[in-house]
Amino acid sequence: MIKPGDVISYLEMCTDEGVNLQRGMNFHLRGDVSVILMSLRPNAPYADRVEEDGHVLIYEGHDVSKTQDTPIPKIVDQPMNNPGGTLTQNGLFYKAAKEYSSRKKHPELVKVYEKLHAGIWVYNGIFKIIDAWQHTMSLLSMAPV
């Protein structure tokens, strides 16, 4: 059994979860268990962070996929809904947080793994999803003087 703080391989992580983890957000992956894969490494694609001595995690969510129509996913709002209207992973986690904050449900539990290096992860434990928000990032273009 993997315990918080254990450093494990990608294969061990997938074996423990019983699935081949491919995306960062996995809402109710198996039953009521959700899984988040995060990275705090330099040049990580998302601005995930840890606050309050490891008691609070801020997870940025999923960008849209890079396509010919969206060559720079960071300039497109992270979608809450799929084209067919169902909730995306962003939408599912957001809804769960809002249902908790409005006292409609207990907080969702999420297992968090943090990428240390290619193929090497640390299990950070189980966290409660207690809040979610959307915020606008501005992209600044600078030209040399």
PLM region descriptions:
Residues 1-122:
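Acidic, glycine-rich low-complexity segments with interspersed aromatic residues
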Residues 116-145:
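Compact mixed alphabeta submodule
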